[in-house]
A protein has these predicted regions:
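A nucleotide- and high-energy phosphate-metabolite-utilizing enzyme signature
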Residues: 1, 9-537
Length: 537
């Protein structure tokens, strides 16, 4: 208690002269404590140890901290917290040994203040599992990795504090700054799930969450150190999501088949279509999964202990896949899942049949739904159904369209998006990388328009779902000049790279308006020429 009162007094005086505060802190810590008996004597020893062999605000100055006053105040707040007060003597002794090393090694990083203050929430998270402190103390290279990463990314520091078990990844330097291949991911998943009983669904879901968190840490570390460019970052995050979806489908299907048996039909099959960022191979760290579930063979029933018609089976399967992907477990959740792009949106069925999807896309879908179809891929499911869905996508994209009506519909949708955005944020001095004129959405809309307008004459426009390769295809077909395609591609990559960097700092995807002004004006000029009226709003 005396220790906490002393530190509270110290924190209140941090606004005074640094030398005076440091000296006063050391004097206060050294005051005798009003305790008695062996336990009290041991507490006194631990409390006295919390002066950390002379560690003070001035020692942070000597270690190279640029904002020693603020950093020392953060340390004082940490020491004055209920977390530290509740520690058992062993945990306090471990903290006593660890914190000076933390301050010293943070001082050796490029950003000592950020490294120290952002690492304290992680230290707090592991205080009651203080073996982690010993682990880091005995593995200084792992501690150095921790400090470097949290100093580089506030998002990553928060993630490590929320999932302190990720410290295990820091011990494996050979893999920390490299992302696993798809085959390695499959092997890792198999290895982890083999240890878990098939009937323990929550344990399987938790294992998948831990695998996902570990891989995301590796991808983020690789991006922060420059070993992965933006497209490779998105590729790896996309591969990770696909493996998780495949595994969620396998787990959910095995559970249902055990109870109801396999669906019986010549055409029986189930598939998962990815839309949006996942469909376009552009997933980022916090992206939702936009999914649509499709099945075929609705006219049969299962052959198992309990009979169920195929429609109910596949609907239940879709629901279970969503559950595995999005339910909260003690290890967290995998992803947020969004099903609103299915036929008829929120009012539509969770899973739709292939014939119903075909009718909807050819007869009822809005232009914006065909725009969304440009960025779709089948990411899991039965091969025969996947082939049928890919053929349907090509057919819909290649439908004959009156270009002026198409252009008007695309521009109207862009105007609606722009109006909604302007209503919520009307700051001329800022540039929303995604939604503002000359940003990401304008590039995506002009690409989608050109695909829908010309896929009937140029089949290669239906092959890819990502913007960069679609721009390359548009250049090859002569629909975009080479210099324009190059400029739009570079702007798109620059915008996305900035979006990722801002996300890793826990910030919204916007910058000062002047930062991308030249690129933004070029994008507006090119997209307006390719799609007259796009910039009119």
């Amino acid at each position: 208690r005396d220790l906490h009162l002393s530190i509270r007094r110290q924190r209140q005086m941090c606004i005074r002269d640094r030398r005076e505060v440091a000296a006063l802190f050391n004097d206060l810590i050294a005051e005798p404590l009003a305790t008695s008996g062996d336990d009290a004597s041991r507490d006194k020893e631990v409390a006295s140890g919390l002066s950390f062999s002379g560690l003070s605000q001035m020692s942070l100055v000597e270690l190279g901290y640029q904002h020693a006053e603020e950093s020392w105040a953060a340390v004082a707040d940490f020491l004055d917290s209920t977390w530290v007060a509740a520690l058992q003597p062993e945990g306090r002794r471990r903290l006593e040994a660890f914190l000076p090393l933390l301050c010293e090694m943070a001082g050796a990083t490029r950003e000592p203040d950020s490294a120290l203050t952002r690492s304290l929430p992680f230290v707090r998270a592991v205080c009651r599992r203080s073996a982690y402190l010993v682990l880091l103390q005995e593995n200084p290279r792992a501690l150095r990795h921790l400090l470097t990463l949290v100093a580089s990314s506030i998002w990553l520091s928060e993630r490590l504090a929320a999932r302190p078990e990720l410290v295990d990844e820091l011990l494996h330097e050979s893999t920390l700054y490299s992302a696993p291949s798809r085959d390695e991911l499959h092997a890792l998943v198999r290895q982890q799930l083999l240890r878990i009983p098939e009937e323990d669904l929550e344990a399987q879901m938790s294992a998948l969450s831990r695998i996902k968190d570990g891989v995301i840490l590796r991808v983020a570390a690789s991006e922060l150190t420059g070993t992965l460019p933006i497209m490779k970052v998105s590729d790896n995050l996309t591969f990770l999501a696909e493996v998780m979806i495949e595994q969620a489908l396998a787990v959910a299907r095995a559970e249902l088949v055990q109870r109801y048996g396999e669906p019986q039909s010549d055409r029986a099959g189930f598939a998962v279509i990815a839309y949006g960022k996942l469909g376009g191979l552009e997933l980022s760290y916090g992206s939702d999964l936009d999914l649509v579930f499709v099945f075929d063979g609705a006219d049969g029933e299962t052959a198992g202990p309990k009979v169920m018609d195929n429609t109910r089976f596949y609907t239940r399967l879709a629901q279970r896949v969503v559950h595995v992907l999005s339910a909260q477990t003690y290890a967290g959740r995998l992803y947020e899942v969004d099903l609103r792009l299915r036929p008829d949106g929120d009012s539509g069925l969770v899973a739709t049949t292939l014939p119903a999807l075909r009718r909807y896309q050819l007869e009822s879908a809005w232009v914006w739904e065909h725009q969304a179809l440009v960025r779709t891929r089948v990411v899991a499911g039965d091969l025969a159904l996947k082939t049928s869905l890919e053929a349907l996508r090509r057919e819909v994209l290649a439908m004959p369209r009156e270009q002026s009506e198409l252009a008007s519909a695309v521009c109207d949708m862009r105007d609606k998006m722009r109006a909604e955005h302007t209503a919520s944020s009307n700051r001329r001095e800022r540039f929303d990388l995604k939604r503002d004129p000359g940003g990401i959405v304008d590039i995506e809309f002009v690409v989608q328009y050109l695909v829908l307008a010309h896929a009937g004459e140029h089949a290669e426009l239906t092959v890819w779902s990502d913007v960069i390769r679609l721009l390359e295809a548009l250049e090859r077909t002569g629909l975009i000049a080479a210099n324009e395609a190059k400029m739009l591609s570079q702007a798109y990559l620059d915008y996305r790279s900035a979006t990722h960097s801002l996300g890793l700092q826990g910030r919204a995807a916007e910058t000062d308006a002047a930062e991308f002004e030249a690129q933004r004006q070029q994008v507006k000029q090119i997209t307006e020429a390719l799609l007259p009226g796009l910039q009119a709003g």
